[in-house]
Amino acid sequence: SRGASADMEPARIEDIVETVVRLASTDYDLKKKYDFRQIEIVRDYDPGLETLVCDHTEIEQVLLNLVKNAAQAMSEAGLSRTPRITLRTRRAGEYGCIEVEDNGPGMDEHTQRRVFEPFFTTKAVGSGTGLGLSVSYFIVTEQHKGAIDVSSSPGEGTCFTVCLPLGGKSAR
């Protein structure tokens, strides 16, 4: 594995999140059972949040994976409520945090404990490799010296939080 990414540069968190929304909304794969256009997107951005020094392509990949997972989980749950993804940015000490929260089926403690393990998946055979979240975990924790966490309970939706050092400071 390589060390710190060579493509670290300042980027506004809000711009990264908006790029992810744009990428997700143009993802019309008929094999997928969801239409991103049917999902309500709620934006809750902290206007005082400064730039992150990151590899924005890698962080976009992480967030896109989280957004797609949320969309898929909500569609497979057959919710009676309007599917909603809330994208929230906030500062936590020396970190800029991005939350991807859905109002989907949620997950139990066992699933939450295993969700970042390689090859662990809750998706149907053939529709997921179980690598997305383990790769995301590596990108956030190893490449960016940040943290990624999940909080969820069955029937209550899921929230993934990605926290990255502000100003390029290492979290080591």
Predicted regions and their residues:
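A conserved beta-strand-to-alpha-helix junction within the catalytic ATP-binding
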Residues: 9-22, 42
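Short helix N-cap motif at coil->helix boundaries in the Bergerat
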Residues: 13, 106-114, 128
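Conserved catalytic submotifs in the C-terminal HATPase_c
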Residues: 35-50
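Short beta-strand-loop-beta element adjacent to the nucleotide/active-site pocket used for signaling
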Residues: 80-98
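Acidic ATP/Mg2+-coordinating residue in the GHKL
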Residues: 102
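Short alpha-helical Gxxx[C/S/T] motif in the catalytic ATP-binding
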Residues: 132-137
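Detector for a conserved hydrophobic position within an alpha-helical segment of the HATPase_c
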Residues: 140-141
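Glycine-rich ATP-binding loops of the HATPase_c
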Residues: 144-151
